[in-house]
Amino acid sequence: RRQRQMCIRDSLTPLEGLVMGTRCGDIDASVVFHLMRQGGYTVDEMDTMFNRESGVKAMIGSSDMRDLDDLMAAHDPVGQRCWDVYVHRVKRYLGAYMAELGGLDVIVFTAGIGEKSPEMRFSCLEGLEELGIEVDEKANNHRMSTPTIISTPTSKVTVMVVPTNEELAISRHALQFAK
């Protein structure tokens, strides 16, 4: 908002939000009670299930998004379902953020699948042209080693891919503590 980064996440744990490699993302809270009653799970087992055994791993048997890419290339229906769930959640959050902020200036894809899967980026943004998001397919399909804009020149929302440099980020944080 007003050219400032915003994070709207205010949950207790990292479970809220998107489906992740091993985390479930948003779920109906009653699922917890149902599983404990019907499945006999303990609190610790539920914690392990939601944090380490859910998400993409529960859907395809692996938390590695490259395995999801392989399943998609093989036209596997289980892979397609996982892909659809992931894309649906991303689009739902984009819409929610746009509503809360009154629009978006920039969407940034980074790390893992955001950085390395042009197909996933395209799927997440496909059909959002009415919201001012237009992807340049040629730019999206290039391998990026520097921050790259992948939206069209006429897109109202700038879409970027920013390669992750975790070592640099860690070094910068460490320097702050060293001062």
Q: Which residue ranges define each predicted feature?
A:
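Short, small-residue-biased leader/transition segments that mark boundaries at the very start
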Residues: R2-I8
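Internal helix-turn-beta structural module
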Residues: Q80-L104, V108, G114-K179
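Hydrophobic alpha-helical scaffolding
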Residues: G21-G25, M36, A58, W83, ...
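A general structural signal for well-ordered alpha-helical segments in protein cores
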Residues: A29-V32, M65, R121, S171
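A conserved active-site cap/scaffold subdomain adjacent to cofactor or substrate pockets
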Residues: R9-N51
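Short gly/pro-enriched beta-turn/loop segments at secondary-structure junctions
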Residues: I27, N51, S63, G102-L104
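A mobile "lid/hinge" subdomain adjacent to the ATP/sugar-phosphate binding pocket shared
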Residues: G39-C82
